[in-house]
């Protein structure tokens, strides 16, 4: 066991050979490396599997022994300065290592097929492997200096992957936006680290917390300064985990390839901010005002992320705002001091959201064959719909991830979110009401995504691309709700909708696809791969198709995680049955924070609390089903809903409220616009003023001196040309000047 911990230093360096070898291969043997590019997926996956096995072994030792291991090497520069590097192995390290490696392996397998036709395949795997190295180095760091180094490397990999398709201006701008926004938080983190070193003289986690607690207990430190240092450290987590007000970079980060959204922007990198707060929680917990601030930022982010997600049309940006909201729940739990619950939700959310992102990638992958490689179309949920029959496996996986995020038992996020809601009532009833309301809102926007994508009809074939109002059978509002259009008796597109029944693929069902749209076209629409155009020419009529097996494999494994990973944190005990493996793993850290690791509830209390949270989730699902139901839904036959819908359409106040909510959500809460006006525009004006001052004043003075010298030189050059007339003129001029001065002063 001791040897296992001593060998843990290899964890962050195991995936490193892949990007090095890819770089050397492209430099020395570019043709051979590119021809064998698919080969590089195997070592990337294999090396990460080794790290995963090592991490699981460490976790088993942690559960059995409940101890913390730290190994440090000191590099003495002189008698007054020495640098210490090492690694820290505790429960938090084990959890994060398993999370990074498991999700990373599945994303690498998924990416091998998803990125197979991309010219940047090798570059993608090099970036991804280097990101895994950086993230593993971050979670195993034993001091704040190492944390900051790997923190910046993680950010660099994120920027490279966000701007992976750098030839697209939108992706390049998103990369710059992520960089600038995170610079704010990272600068605060650096200042906080320097401030702590100035106070304590140490940056090692094993010494830092004890020194700070002693200084605070003995009143030997300025409480305002130590609070400022804590706030600056927290700024780094706010930016990295996309918390308000530094959240604006995360939705734009979806411009990168979808697999990296599953790994970086759902499971690992954005969780780095949560990890840092969890690592420094013994320090934060000594300053109650900082804990309250963490909880306050968390609850604001919870609400903001949920409200901004309810009207987005881009499926990935919808999931990005969902990630932002769920990270807010984790930050809220840490602010309340619920260390175990925050990490529990970090685990359950990582697998559920990775499943949703990979599912969205499968959907986008199938849509690209129809609408082209344009994110505005392939990721637009308004052009989807009716995908259940075309991508049934993806649909099932996406539904499971959706139910998990909504908090429906027995899926993973139900167990963790339910505990956060319960603890919020003990912390603050106001925060609890907001958190519970947002849980219902989460169910609403997640089922909105599901209904728009998988239910109804395939809207690409009915969407109006030409701007003509009468060219579609169905109109789709900005909210994504379908509404029937009245068809004229004479329809000139019937021949385009007539399908050939000879060449039908096995993926498609035999029943009519768009039956009963209208009596005039009731029997003419069926789903086939080819159609006859005016009876003479065949042209392909594409429909979405299921993804390849390698992509589906990763999704199915994540489905299993979403089903069963919640069992590790079940905290209720009955008749000696203890299922809370997570508390056993976290027992060293929980003892450090003076929390009771034996906290549990009985079955009755559990079912009482769960019934309330599940009822909220089902209410949100019901509202989403009402507003985004397909046009053929049997809910339309209910007199109560018809009556409500009729009254709602006549209510001007309700329309005003709904439109206001939509404008708020679709325009990102006007926060980006506010930053554009108050910060970006101001910086640009200042830059223009600085440019004017630099060119006209700083450069103007030496330029003026140079021009003046040039003119004087030219004048003397003309006078000294050798002409007698020039000399006489010059002599007369100075004689007259002398006489004028003489008579002015002396006479």
UniProtKB/Swiss-Prot annotation:
It is found in: Plastid, Chloroplast thylakoid membrane. It catalyses: a plastoquinone + NADH + (n+1) H(+)(in) = a plastoquinol + NAD(+) + n H(+)(out); a plastoquinone + NADPH + (n+1) H(+)(in) = a plastoquinol + NADP(+) + n H(+)(out). The chain crosses the membrane at residues 9-29, 40-60, 89-109, 125-145, 147-167, 185-205, 219-239, 258-278, 280-300, 327-347, 354-374, 396-416, 425-445, 552-572, 606-626, 727-747. InterPro entries: NADH_UbQ_OxRdtase_chlpt_su5_C, NADHpl_OxRdtase_5_subgr, ND/Mrp_TM, NU5C-like, Proton_antipo_N. GO terms for molecular function: NADH dehydrogenase (ubiquinone) activity; quinone binding. Keywords: Chloroplast, Membrane, NAD, NADP, Plastid, Plastoquinone, Quinone, Thylakoid, Translocase, Transmembrane, Transmembrane helix, Transport. GO terms for cellular component: chloroplast thylakoid membrane. Its EC number is 7.1.1.-. It comes from the Eukaryota. GO terms for biological process: ATP synthesis coupled electron transport; electron transport coupled proton transport. It is a multi-pass membrane protein. Its main location: plastid. Belongs to the complex I subunit 5 family. NDH is composed of at least 16 different subunits, 5 of which are encoded in the nucleus. NDH shuttles electrons from NAD(P)H:plastoquinone, via FMN and iron-sulfur (Fe-S) centers, to quinones in the photosynthetic chain and possibly in a chloroplast respiratory chain. The immediate electron acceptor for the enzyme in this species is believed to be plastoquinone. Couples the redox reaction to proton translocation, and thus conserves the redox energy in a proton gradient. This is NAD(P)H-quinone oxidoreductase subunit 5, chloroplastic. It comes from Lotus japonicus. The gene is ndhF.
């Amino acid at each position: 066991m001791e040897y296992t911990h001593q060998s843990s230093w290899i964890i962050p360096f195991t995936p490193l050979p892949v990007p090095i070898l890819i770089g050397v291969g492209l430099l020395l043997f570019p043709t051979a490396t590119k021809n064998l590019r698919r080969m590089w997926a195997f070592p990337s996956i294999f090396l990460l599997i080794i790290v995963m096995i090592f991490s699981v072994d460490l976790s088993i030792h942690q559960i059995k022994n409940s101890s913390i291991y730290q190994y440090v090497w000191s590099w003495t520069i002189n008698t007054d300065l020495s640098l210490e590097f090492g690694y820290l192995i505790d429960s938090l390290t084990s959890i994060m290592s398993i999370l990074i490696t498991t999700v990373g392996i599945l994303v690498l397998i998924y990416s091998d097929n998803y990125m197979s036709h991309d010219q940047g395949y090798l570059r993608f795997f090099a970036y991804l492997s280097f990101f895994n190295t950086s993230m593993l180095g971050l979670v195993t760091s034993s001091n704040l200096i190492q944390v900051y180094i790997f923190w910046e490397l993680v950010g660099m990999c994120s920027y490279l992957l966000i701007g992976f398709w750098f030839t697209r201006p939108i992706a390049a701008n998103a990369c710059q936006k992520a960089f600038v926004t995170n610079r704010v938080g990272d600068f605060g983190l650096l200042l906080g680290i320097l401030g702590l070193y100035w106070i304590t003289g140490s940056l090692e986690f094993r010494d830092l917390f004890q020194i700070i607690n002693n200084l605070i207990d003995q009143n030997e430190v300025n409480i305002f300064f130590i609070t400022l240092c804590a706030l600056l450290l927290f700024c780094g987590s706010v930016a990295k985990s996309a918390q308000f007000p530094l959240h604006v970079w995360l939705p734009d980060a979806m411009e990168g390839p979808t697999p990296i959204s599953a790994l970086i922007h759902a499971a690992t990198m954005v969780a780095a901010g949560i990890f840092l707060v969890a690592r420094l929680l013994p320090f934060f917990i000594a300053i109650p005002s900082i804990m309250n601030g963490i909880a306050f930022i968390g609850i604001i982010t919870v609400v903001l992320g949920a409200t901004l997600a309810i009207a987005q049309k881009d499926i990935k940006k919808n999931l990005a705002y969902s990630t932002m909201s769920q990270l807010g729940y984790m930050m809220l739990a840490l602010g309340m001091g619920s260390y175990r619950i925050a990490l529990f939700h970090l685990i359950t959310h990582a697998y559920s959201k990775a499943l949703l992102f990979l599912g969205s990638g499968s959907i986008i992958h199938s849509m690209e064959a129809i609408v082209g490689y344009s994110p505005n179309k392939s990721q637009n949920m308004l052009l989807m719909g009716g995908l259940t029959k075309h991508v049934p496996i993806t649909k099932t996986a996406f539904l499971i991830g959706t139910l998990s995020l909504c908090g429906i038992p027995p899926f993973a996020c139900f167990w963790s979110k339910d505990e956060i809601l319960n603890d919020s009532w003990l912390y603050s009833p106001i925060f609890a009401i907001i958190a519970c309301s947002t849980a219902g809102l989460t169910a609403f926007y997640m089922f909105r995504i599901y209904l728009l994508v998988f239910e109804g009809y395939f809207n690409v074939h009915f969407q109006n691309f030409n701007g003509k109002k009468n060219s579609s059978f169905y109109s789709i509002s900005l909210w994504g709700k379908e509404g029937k259009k009245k068809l004229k008796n004479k329809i000139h597109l019937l021949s385009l909708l007539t399908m050939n029944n000879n060449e039908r693929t096995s993926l498609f069902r035999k029943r009519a696809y768009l039956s009963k749209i209208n009596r005039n076209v009731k029997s003419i629409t069926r789903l086939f791969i080819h159609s006859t155009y005016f009876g003479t020419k065949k042209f392909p009529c594409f429909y979405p198709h299921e993804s390849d097996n390698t992509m589906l494999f990763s999704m199915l494994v994540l489905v299993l995680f979403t089903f069963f990973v919640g069992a590790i944190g079940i905290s209720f005990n009955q008749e000696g049955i203890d299922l809370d493996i997570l508390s056993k793993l976290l027992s060293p850290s929980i003892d450090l924070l003076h929390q009771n690791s034996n906290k549990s509830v009985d079955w009755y209390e559990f079912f009482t609390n769960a019934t309330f949270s599940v009822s909220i989730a089902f209410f949100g699902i019901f509202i989403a089903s009402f507003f985004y139901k397909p046009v053929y839904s049997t809910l339309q036959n209910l007199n109560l809903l018809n009556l409500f819908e009729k009254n709602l359409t006549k209510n001007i106040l309700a329309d005003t409220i709904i439109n206001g909510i939509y404008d708020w959500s679709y325009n990102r809460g006007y926060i980006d616009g506010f930053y554009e006006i108050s910060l970006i525009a101001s910086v640009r004006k200042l830059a223009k003023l600085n440019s004017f001052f630099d060119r006209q004043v700083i450069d103007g003075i030496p330029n003026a001196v140079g021009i003046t010298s040039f003119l004087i030189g030219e004048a003397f050059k003309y006078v000294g040309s050798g002409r007698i007339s020039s000399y006489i003129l010059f002599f007369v001029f100075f004689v007259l000047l002398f006489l004028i001065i003489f008579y002015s002063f002396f006479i």
